[in-house]
Amino acid sequence: EAVFKFTANQEKEHGKIFYNFLKEMTGENITIDGSYPVDIYDDVLKLLRSAQHNEFEEFEPVYPDFAAVANQEGFTNIGAKFNQIAKIEKTHGDRFGMFADLLEQGKLFVSDVEEEWMCLNCGYVHKSSEAPKSCPVCSHPQGYFVRLKLAPFTTL
């Protein structure tokens, strides 16, 4: 869940950037035409893989195509933002793919070597080759643990 929320917050910021461009056109009529896939699954692996696919689609071809149209219409600053954000979408796709790979390999909560695992709820760090089944501090389940090196805002 945390990887989806973390990414969604970044996507929200992308939306704000484009919303601010729209605000500059207040009072005008513009046409916006687009579609977006609806991928709702109960299976986490399917969610991760579809998120990976959709982020890669935004990376190439969707956002570069939007950038080209913006540039053709004289909105070079908007085109530049689409190109910059496209690169971020690739990072999102890579992240979803990494977690999907770990899940497929049965290594999301298990490692071949000793690692530090962080509870994303309370910050408890556990050193072992496997994340605990539940956090000994806050009792949240294993799903709240990530490798410390993958936890947001950590410096190693």
Where are these regions (language model features)?
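Non-heme di-metal
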Residues: E1-L156
